[in-house]
């Protein structure tokens, strides 16, 4: 950003400070606050401005026992949120000392508490408050069922997430506060329990193996069964384990699997036992299916964990009304290995099978089990939107693209036929068609062979509204 533009923002902030210090707040003060907030995102620093006086002025409003009806406190907090990261944190501490932050968090003024969280979130170094009771107070507020201010809860969660990259903060959370966290977990009160699950989900991404504590991050069979009494709590618990497994895969935290493997079958048992636990199927089928999908991606010992859950409880293929969901969600490598007959017998190309196709085609062996279900005649009988959904799916992988290019030239003709680009007005159809063209072009000229030029020409018409010509390739690439 230019010096001129930076000066403009600094002048706006100076104007804001002056107007906030007037005896009577101007009528347009909220407009100015909003203007400052919007412009602060355009700068990375304020080199010629001392922000302490403005922060002190804002602090005066937040700590005042008088509530100013004409002042939008959300806008005021937004300015604090953007201003604090730009300031030297030593300067911030001159205005908001550690003692001030403690007083703010213990006050009855929610905007002041939120402002304190914004300051704490940006502390430098991040472990600055690890030896103070500030972290303890944040946890007390977070798990207080009487606290109903969503903005405050969000501010606390955001602050803890930002600071938890620091090992000292994590020690404060899970060593000093372990007995307290265990007590929150043990009472299983809906509000605090759901917040605890959200908190643990956030924290797990930062936890290393030696830091992991089963007593707080894992749940017993008894706790899971008790959670069914409040189906919302049970759903949160299911989602927690789903995110837990996803984090294991995404962050390569396979050391954590041994902590949860024994308890995961309990969810499958509850799913099966509709007689004793009817609410589980009635209200949590979708989230449970997502959990089972994640378990099916644990490849350890030839999918032994999911294979056992499948054999003992889920029984994929035995319940006709769930086959679609299984084929849409479960790891296609597992399906083709252990339920190839279900895949071959149930999948058919239609507008209703797009979700299944997207999942099954993600594995080459599984796709080979269904490729004989395709023919140009079957695909071309579909409405054009559904044609494009099928084609777009077939362009996602090398092996499916090769099948489309070599085995279904008539379908390719429908994709790049004369006038297609200009004739389509439905935005969803345009999206899938353009995505299919782009996916194929990404395979490169050599693999596309004779299809390359017509695909490039059609994509140019779709994106630029004109035919491709020499020199336009850069423009096409820029639009992709």
Curated annotation (Swiss-Prot):
Gene3D superfamilies recorded: 1.25.10.50, 1.25.40.580
Residue intervals passing through the bilayer: none
GO cellular component: cytoplasm; cytosol; nucleus
GO biological process: mismatch repair; proteasome regulatory particle assembly
SUPFAM superfamilies assigned: ARM repeat
Keyword annotations from UniProtKB, A to Z: Chaperone, Cytoplasm, DNA damage, DNA repair
Example of a GO MF term: protein folding chaperone
InterPro entries in the cross-refs: ARM-type_fold (IPR016024), HSM3_C (IPR040752), HSM3_N (IPR041335)
Localization, UniProt: Cytoplasm
A Pfam family: HSM3_C
Major location category of this protein: cytoplasm
Similarity comment text for this entry: Belongs to the proteasome subunit S5B/HSM3 family.
Other remarks on this protein: Present with 468 molecules/cell in log phase SD medium.
Function summary: Involved in DNA mismatch repair in slow-growing cells. Acts as a chaperone during the assembly of the 26S proteasome, specifically of the base subcomplex of the 19S regulatory complex (RC).
Subunit composition and interactions: Interacts with RPT1, RPT2, RPT3, RPT5, RPT6, RPN1 and RPN2. Part of transient complex (BP1) containing HSM3, RPT1, RPT2 and RPT5 formed during the assembly of the 26S proteasome.
Protein name per the record: DNA mismatch repair protein HSM3
Gene: HSM3
């Amino acid at each position: 950003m230019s010096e001129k533009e930076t000066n403009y923002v600094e002048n706006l902030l100076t104007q804001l400070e002056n107007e906030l210090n007037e005896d009577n707040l101007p009528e347009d003060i909220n407009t100015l606050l909003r203007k400052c907030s919007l412009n602060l995102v355009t700068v990375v620093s304020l080199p010629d401005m001392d922000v302490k006086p403005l922060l002190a002025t804002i602090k005066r409003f937040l700590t005042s026992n008088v509530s100013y009806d004409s002042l939008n406190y959300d806008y005021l907090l937004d300015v604090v949120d953007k201003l604090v990261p730009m300031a030297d944190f030593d300067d911030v501490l001159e205005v908001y000392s550690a003692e001030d932050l403690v007083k703010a968090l213990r006050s009855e003024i929610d905007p002041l508490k939120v402002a304190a969280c914004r300051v704490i979130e940006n502390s430098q170094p991040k472990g600055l408050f690890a030896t103070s009771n500030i972290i303890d107070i944040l946890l007390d507020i977070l798990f207080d069922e009487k606290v109903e201010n969503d903005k405050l809860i969000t501010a606390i969660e955001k602050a803890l997430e930002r600071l938890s990259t620091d090992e000292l903060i994590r020690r404060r959370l899970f060593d000093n506060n372990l007995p307290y966290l265990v007590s929150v977990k043990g009472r299983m009160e809906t509000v605090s329990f759901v917040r605890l699950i959200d908190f643990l989900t956030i924290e797990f991404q930062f936890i290393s193996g030696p830091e992991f504590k089963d007593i707080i991050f894992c749940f017993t069979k008894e706790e899971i069964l008790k959670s069914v009494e409040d189906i919302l709590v049970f759903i949160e618990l299911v989602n927690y384990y789903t995110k837990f497994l996803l984090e294991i895969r995404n962050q390569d935290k396979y050391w954590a699997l041994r902590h949860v493997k024994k308890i995961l079958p309990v969810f499958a048992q509850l799913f099966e036992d509709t007689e004793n636990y009817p609410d589980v199927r009635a209200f949590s089928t979708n989230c449970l299916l997502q959990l089972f999908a994640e378990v099916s991606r644990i490849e350890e010992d030839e999918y032994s964990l999911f294979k056992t859950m499948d054999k003992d409880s889920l029984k994929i293929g035995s319940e006709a009304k769930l086959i679609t969901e299984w084929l849409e969600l479960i790891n296609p490598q597992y399906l083709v290995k252990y339920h190839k007959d279900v895949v071959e017998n149930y999948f058919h190309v239609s507008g209703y099978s797009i979700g299944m196709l997207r999942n099954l085609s993600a594995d080459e062996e599984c796709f080979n089990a269904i490729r004989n279900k395709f023919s140009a005649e079957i695909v071309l009988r579909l409405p054009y939107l559904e044609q494009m959904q099928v084609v777009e799916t077939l362009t996602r992988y090398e092996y499916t693209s090769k099948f489309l290019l070599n085995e279904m030239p008539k379908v390719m003709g429908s994709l790049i036929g004369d006038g297609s680009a200009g004739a389509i007005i439905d935005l969803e159809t345009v999206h899938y068609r353009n995505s299919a063209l782009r996916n194929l072009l990404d395979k490169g000229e050599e693999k596309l062979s004779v299809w390359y030029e017509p695909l490039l020409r059609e994509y140019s018409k779709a994106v630029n509204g004109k035919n491709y010509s020499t020199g336009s390739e850069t423009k096409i690439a820029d639009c992709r």
